[in-house]
Each structure stands twice: as structure tokens, then as C-alpha cells.
């Protein structure tokens, strides 16, 4: 089958995980495009409040884009906790918008029901490989009858891929910082 992944909020940051996870389970992954004014306008009618941050408002357009491409299944989980990236950090909570914005989408986008899209947004903790894997095993057994052993294997590969992607980004960041230092240029 096909799974739609909206390129929004923490889904963007954790995309290496989700892409690998779903490919390992045999899904074809369709990622919404980069954010733009056109994407924003696609979902503007379903935004329930002007007080939401712009990145959250963009989520409506990304979901609409996927729906307009007849994606039968969209995955956008609620993630209250991320990995603790810095030892000694006081917390590793996501902001309330990131934590549960897919609930807002589910309750304000009638297109999901009208087009009979399976919108899966379970609450999950991204705190560790073991915790996330166990939660995914339960969800995908219940929703798709995928054996827990298959989901566990896919989750392991996905966790390793995310770790490698983060290492690659860190390495590139160090290269850029060294370049700026060597050339006397400035960067943000």
C-alpha cells in the first residue's frame, strides 16, 4: 500500500525514521512537498484558529496535498516526547502544537472522512528505540495485522537509519563551521 507522510513539524525532523520504517514494511512512501505559500493556501479553510503558529497552520495544506493525490493512508502520530539529545537536559518534551497537532487535523479536516482516508495518529513516545518499537508493534498489529516481529525489525532498521542521518547532519555542520572559520565568512 501507500502511506502519506506530511512534511511538517517533527515529522520533518524524524522523516528518515518513518521513511525507513514504512519501506521495510512494504509501503510506498509519499512525502508532501516543501512548504510554500501554495501549500499554506491549500489548507487555509480548515485552520480553526488564527492563534496557531505558522508551522502548525502549514500542516493543513500538507494533509490536503496528500488527500488530493488520493493517498489512502496518512500517518501523523502525536509525539509528546523526543529522544533526550543532551545529557543533563531538563526535559525532552515537544511543544503542545507538535505533541498533538494531528488531533487538530483529524477533528477539523472533513476531507479525511469525505475521501475515506485512513488517518492514523496514535500517541507515541520517541524516547527510545525500545519504547517506540513496542508502541509501533501494538499499533500495526491492531491496524494492519502485521506480525510484531516484522514491525520490530522495521523499527530497528528505522532507528539505525535515523541515527546515521543525524550523524551525517552533525558531520556536515562541523564541516560548514570549519569552512566559515577558515574563510572568515559568517553563517547563521
Residue ranges: model-predicted function:
Residues 1-187:
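An N-terminal assembly and electron-transfer interface module characteristic of large anaerobic redox
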Amino acid at each position: 500500500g501507500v502511506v502519506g507522510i506530511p512534511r511538517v513539524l517533527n515529522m520533518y525532523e524524524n522523516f528518515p525514521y518513518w521513511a525507513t520504517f514504512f519501506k521495510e514494511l512494504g509501503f510506498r512512501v509519499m512525502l508532501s512537498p516543501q512548504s510554500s505559500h501554495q501549500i499554506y493556501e491549500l489548507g487555509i479553510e480548515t485552520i480553526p484558529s488564527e492563534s496557531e503558529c505558522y508551522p502548525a497552520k502549514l500542516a493543513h495544506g500538507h494533509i490536503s496535498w496528500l488527500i488530493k493525490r488520493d493517498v489512502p493512508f496518512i500517518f501523523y502520530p502525536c509525539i509528546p516526547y523526543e529522544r533526550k539529545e543532551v545529557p543533563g537536559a531538563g526535559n525532552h518534551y515537544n511543544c503542545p502544537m507538535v505533541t498533538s497537532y494531528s488531533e487538530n487535523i483529524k477533528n477539523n479536516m472533513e476531507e479525511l472522512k469525505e475521501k475515506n482516508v485512513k488517518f492514523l495518529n496514535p500517541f507515541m513516545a520517541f524516547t527510545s528505540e525500545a519504547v517506540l518499537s513496542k508502541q509501533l508493534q501494538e499499533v500495526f498489529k491492531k491496524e494492519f495485522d502485521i506480525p510484531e516481529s516484522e514491525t520490530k525489525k522495521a523499527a530497528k532498521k528505522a532507528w539505525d537509519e535515523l541515527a546515521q542521518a543525524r550523524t551525517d547532519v552533525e558531520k556536515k555542520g562541523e564541516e560548514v563551521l570549519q569552512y566559515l572559520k577558515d574563510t572568515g565568512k559568517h553563517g547563521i
